[in-house]
Amino acid sequence: HHLALWARRYSPLTGVDEPANGIWIDVAGAEHLFGGVRGLMADCARRLRQSGLHLRFAAAPTCGAAWALAHYARPGIHILPQHDAMPAAAAQPVAPPHTRMRARMRQILAPLPLAALRIETDTESALQRAGLQVIGDIMAMPRAPLAMRFGNDLLRRLDQAFGDVQESFSPLAAPQLMIVSRNFAEPVA
């Protein structure tokens, strides 16, 4: 909780990820103050290392993708950009930014284990018994049979990771500033 309050230096929208003992920071609109997302995350990592903490960082267009990268990608700072840079010139039509971003997210999340989707352990075990080990294994499968066999939560978590279903976190309320004053009859020196 204290770390999430400390992180308000980067954005007023910070929250606690209770089950995973982590924090959420919505940096949209604030990253330019630090030279971009990479600069913001580097500053945060440096300050936390100076305090003796070593954390894993990820920035992504969705909460689900950021969580997956922070918990299951190799250690380091991971950034999935909101939009890939448009090529200066192209011989063929270029896919819109959302399509390119989604393809990049699929590529990066595919090798991560199923637990990166934040699914129940029973569902994860059932998927593994069926021979499905990583996110990429279920991305190409038909959705209806997956839902029938493993439940709708699996598809909801997959959709949250790719931004097809909105997901948000509850930001911490700003600490109340306490101001007390007292008027005296005579000036106090």
What is the predicted function of each stretch?
Residues H1-A189:
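Gly/Gly-Pro- and Ser/Thr-rich, intrinsically disordered tail segments characteristic of DNA damage-repair
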